[in-house]
UniProtKB/Swiss-Prot annotation:
Protein name according to UniProt: Hemin import ATP-binding protein HmuV
Localization, UniProt: Cell inner membrane
Domain spans labelled ABC transporter: 2-241
Organism encoding this protein: Rhizobium etli (strain ATCC 51251 / DSM 11541 / JCM 21823 / NBRC 15573 / CFN 42)
Cellular component, GO annotation: plasma membrane
Gene for this chain: hmuV
Length: 264
């Protein structure tokens, strides 16, 4: 479990996150959503150990700020919102970086691991291409393949591992959005945990178990999809009169964006 309690972050003397509390369970996909600039990425960076914070963030009972970088790398992989690489690395070289930063449970099968990770994100045959030559969506999938090489198994020594994904489908077409979200969902089904910053509320409703809504750096709501995705909460958090409907087959909520045409 990842337990976030009283999380607060200040950057350049300004409060960005204030007193955020929630828990993410292994075996579940927890989505973090909210308006632009609400503090979602800052929250994720604090959870991953990239930013100093007040309060508590625990992974498997261990305080994140007390763990060394190599200890964090062994239990969580991070997909950043954007990645800029100055040197002309090939796709293969980028993906293999994940093998050097994680546990690399099978060092004798490094090439196979890299190939399998690329195949899982639909990039077979891209190994020799230069990263800078790829489209934004292709680069995003390369970075996810790197993360999958770092955290290759959802459970290691009886303890769950985590994928921390910041807007993992923001640059992807609908087909690859479904591919990546299904991959994340399957990681959870195998016992691992996923926290993903999401903007698409319908993908969130389709794939997430729980959702955390952040507004202006504070927790606005947290709970199951059915508990959080309500007309009243959408109006309160996003300022839009969004209508939440349900798919007849299984009752999964979905957001009817057309209902917000009156949104200022």
């Amino acid at each position: 479990m990842i337990e976030v309690s009283g999380l607060s972050v200040r950057l350049s003397g300004k409060s960005i996150i204030s007193d955020v509390t929630f828990a993410a369970k292994a075996g579940e996909l927890t989505a973090i959503a909210g308006p632009n600039g609400s503090g979602k990425t800052t929250t994720m960076k604090a959870i991953s150990g990239e930013l100093a914070y007040d309060g508590s963030v625990r992974i498997g009972g261990d305080e994140v700020k007390g763990l060394k970088p190599w200890q964090l790398a062994a239990v969580r992989g991070v997909l950043p919102q954007a990645s800029t690489i100055s040197f002309p690395f090939t796709v293969r070289e980028i993906v293999r970086m994940g093998l050097t930063s994680g546990l690399n449970l099978h060092p004798d099968k490094s090439d196979q691991a890299a190939a399998a990770a690329l195949a899982s994100v639909d990039l077979v045959g891209f190994e020799g291409r230069f990263y800078q030559e790829l489209s934004g969506g292709e680069q995003q999938r390369v970075q996810l393949a790197r993360v999958l090489c770092q955290i290759s198994e959802p459970i290691v020594d009886g303890k769950p591992c985590w994928l921390l994904l910041d807007e993992p489908v923001s640059s992807l077409d609908i087909s690859h959005q479904l591919t990546i979200m299904t991959l994340a969902r399957n990681f959870c089904k195998r016992g691992g945990g996923v926290i993903a910053v999401m903007h698409d509320l319908n993908l969130t409703a389709l794939f997430a178990d729980r959702v955390v809504l952040i507004k202006s750096g504070r927790l606005a709501a947290a709970g199951s999809i059915e508990e959080v995705l309500t007309d009243a909460t959408m109006l309160s958090v996003f300022g839009c009169a969004l209508r939440i409907n349900q798919i007849p087959a299984d009752g999964t909520p979905f957001v009817l964006a057309h209902s917000a045409l009156s949104c200022p």
